[in-house]
Swiss-Prot record:
Phylogenetic placement of the source organism: Bacteria, Pseudomonadati, Pseudomonadota, Betaproteobacteria, Burkholderiales
Signal peptide: none
PANTHER family per record: CELL DIVISION PROTEIN ZAPD (PTHR39455:SF1)
GO CC aspect terms: cell division site; cytoplasm
Keyword Heme attached: no
Entry's Gene Ontology BP terms: division septum assembly; FtsZ-dependent cytokinesis
Keywords annotated in UniProt: Cell cycle, Cell division, Cytoplasm, Septation
Name of the featured protein: Cell division protein ZapD
Function noted in UniProt: Cell division factor that enhances FtsZ-ring assembly. Directly interacts with FtsZ and promotes bundling of FtsZ protofilaments, with a reduction in FtsZ GTPase activity.
UniProt keyword Lyase, yes or no: no
SUBUNIT field: Interacts with FtsZ.
Stored Pfam families: ZapD
Similarity comment: family membership: Belongs to the ZapD family.
Compartments in which it is found: Cytoplasm
C-alpha cells in the first residue's frame, strides 16, 4: 500500500517537511560515495532553512507538553497498561528535555564559518565547484570515514529536533483509526461534524494505478483519485476506488 498524508494546518505541514528532509539527510549521510555526501550536505542546509522560517522548536515542545499532560491523566486509570504508559512518559521526558535544553535548533552549524561559506555557495546553481570553493572539493576527496565523521558531527545538533518531531508525528498518527472506504466514481467527500483534525492519511493499493488529490478544511474533506498516463496531465478516474483512510487528532 502507498501512503499519502495531508495536513490540516501549517504546523503539521512543517513537521512532515522536516520528517522528509531528516529521512533524506540520514540516508545520504551514511557510508557511500562523495556524491551521496554532497546530497547530505545540501539537505542539512535545507533543514536549517526550514527551521528559520518558523519557530518549530516552540511548536513541537508545546505539542509534546500537551500530549504529556494527557498521558499523565491516565495514570492509575482502569484498563490502561501502566508499564507501557510510564515507558512512554519517560521517553517523552527525555525527548522534551533534549530539545528544550539546547538553544536555537542547529545553532552550532550557523556558527561554523566554513559551513556558512559553503551554504552561501550552494545557494548559487553550480556555485560549489572546485573553481568557486576548492576547500569543498578537497573535502569530497577525503576518505569516506572522515566525511562520515564530519557529517555525524554536523547532524548531531539537529538530533533533538528530529527526535521531537518524530515523536509528535508518531503520537498524532497513532490517534487515528484506519477504515475501509470506497470512492464512488473516483471521488469521496466527508463532513467532519465540527471535530478538529490535524492529519488525514490515505492508503492506496499501487495496483489500482491512481493517486489521491486531497483538499480539506475544518468542515469537510474531498478526495479525488486521478491517474497519470505518459506526458498528459493527470485525469480524474470515473471508476470506484477502494482505499483506506485515517483521520488523526492527537
Amino acid at each position: 500500500m502507498i501512503l499519502y498524508e495531508y495536513p490540516f494546518n501549517e504546523r503539521v505541514r512543517a513537521y512532515l517537511r522536516l520528517e522528509y528532509l531528516f529521512d533524506r539527510l540520514f540516508y545520504f549521510a551514511r557510508e557511500g560515495d562523495a556524491r551521496h555526501h554532497q546530497i547530505a550536505v545540501a539537505t542539512l542546509f535545507d533543514i536549517l532553512d526550514a527551521t528559520e522560517r518558523t519557530d518549530i522548536k516552540t511548536s513541537v515542545l508545546q505539542d509534546l507538553e500537551r500530549q504529556r499532560a494527557a498521558l499523565q491523566a491516565l495514570r492509575d486509570h482502569p484498563g490502561v497498561a501502566q508499564d507501557a504508559l510510564e515507558s512512554m512518559l519517560a521517553e517523552m521526558e527525555r525527548t522534551v528535555s533534549g530539545l528544550a535544553g539546547q538553544g536555537r535548533a542547529g545553532q552550532p552549524l550557523r556558527e561554523n564559518e566554513w559551513l556558512v561559506s559553503l551554504r552561501g555557495r550552494l545557494a548559487v546553481p553550480g556555485g560549489a565547484t572546485q573553481v568557486d570553493m576548492p576547500s569543498y572539493h578537497a573535502w569530497q576527496h577525503r576518505t569516506e570515514a572522515v566525511r562520515c565523521a564530519d557529517l555525524q558531527t554536523w547532524t548531531a545538533p539537529l538530533r533533538p529536533l528530529h527526535d521531537a518531531v518524530a515523536m509528535a508525528l508518531r503520537l498524532l498518527r497513532e490517534s487515528g483509526r484506519r477504515s475501509e472506504i470506497v470512492a464512488e466514481q473516483g471521488g469521496y467527500q466527508q463532513m467532519l461534524a465540527g471535530k478538529l483534525f490535524q492529519l488525514l492519511r490515505v492508503w492506496i493499493d499501487p495496483a489500482q494505478g491512481v493517486f489521491p488529490e486531497i483538499s480539506a478544511n475544518k468542515y469537510m474533506i474531498w478526495i479525488r483519485f486521478s491517474a497519470q498516463d505518459g506526458d498528459a496531465k493527470p485525469q480524474q478516474v470515473a471508476r470506484n476506488i477502494d482505499f483506506q483512510m485515517s483521520l488523526c487528532s492527537s
